[in-house]
Amino acid sequence: MCTSANNRLDQLTQILHPENLLNPTNASHPESSLRPDHPFKIAVVGSGNWGTTIAKIVSENAVARPHLFSHFVNMWVFEEKIDGTNLTEIINTRHENIKYLPGVKLPKNLIAVPDIVKAVKGADLIVFNLPHQFLPRILKQLKGHVPKTTRAISCLKGLEVNANGCKLLSTVIEEELGIACGALSGANLAPEIARGNWSETTVAYRVPADYRGPGKDIDKLVLKALFHRPYFHVNVIDDVAGVSIAGALKNVVALAVGFVEGLGWGDNAKAAVMRVGLLETIKFAKLFFNDAEIDTFTGESAGVADLITTCSGGRNVKVGRYMAETGCAAEEAEKKLLNGQSSQGIVTTKEVHEFLTNVNKLEEFPLFEATYQITFGSESIENLPNLLNNY
């Protein structure tokens, strides 16, 4: 990031002090970005454990920074019954998502909304946070209901693959809705963050060509103010491609780590898989996304830190481990272990295989391909070391 941008972000702690927000003259470095014409309205699309956690964070900041953000934050919830009661009703009365984030108290200004169009109505910023296989249906429902001046952040992990190539999910959102979209990813296990354990993340956002100016539009300072908490530290960069690719491909690597963990091969084997996975992730970025910055993969929470965390636990490792221990199929493991949530590694493994097949590059990514063949083909986990000999 350029020096001036770093300097602006360094001023954030002082500027966001409540006294400085209420009395701009108190701040030695006034920032009009953080004194908008009107408070920005935020909506979150998705209510799994990560979606609910992010909604909790932005709702807390809406209360802490009333000059900057509208008080109420809408969270779109796919309606379902829990013991005969709608999940939205439970969230709005008990202030707890008892299915996907049990035991965590949610802010009272977080409102669960079952109608997605109503949930995002009037939003200046939409945070997308749901399994990426549901994104096409969601965007179809939103098309025509979101003004072009709305901005978005994608917390989704995955890629869109079709006959025309491979796209970032932030790009899909931009193209389908005609709005600017960045990405958020990092070493972020939702249950730890939801309980207030310290963590850090990376937000990537490029200010669009139709940016309306400080105080009138979402920019990097506003995004840092929205997501940064004492327990959740945020770095804002430009590299949307790097953050998105790292967030997608780490789940493939985690699935493979689960395989070797399930066979009891130990930490050395897991480290070997992670090393190869990082190399293949960087190679994938260099080959197919020219604007991705390699420093993102080594220096940001969204890069190697996220890879380490994801491969140390989480749903993809659990699924891979269970498959190795029991010999069951990926879908069966997912259904048994994840309480209705998705293992993004399974979906992304298939998408990466399809894309690499289309561009005739399978042989250059032996770990990604081995993970696919173990998950969907007839390859054995025991043969994994032989498939990685070239590394």
From Swiss-Prot:
Family annotation (Gene3D superfamilies): N-(1-d-carboxylethyl)-l-norvaline Dehydrogenase, domain 2, NAD(P)-binding Rossmann-like Domain
EC number(s) recorded for this UniProt protein: 1.1.1.8
Positions contributing to NAD(+) binding: G46, S47, G48, N49, W50, G51, F78, F134, A190, R315, Q344
Swiss-Prot/TrEMBL keywords: NAD, Oxidoreductase
Highest taxon listed in the record's lineage: Eukaryota
Reactions catalysed, as given in the entry: sn-glycerol 3-phosphate + NAD(+) = dihydroxyacetone phosphate + NADH + H(+)
An example Gene Ontology molecular-function term: glycerol-3-phosphate dehydrogenase (NAD+) activity
Name used for this protein in its record: Glycerol-3-phosphate dehydrogenase [NAD(+)]
Source species: Candida tropicalis
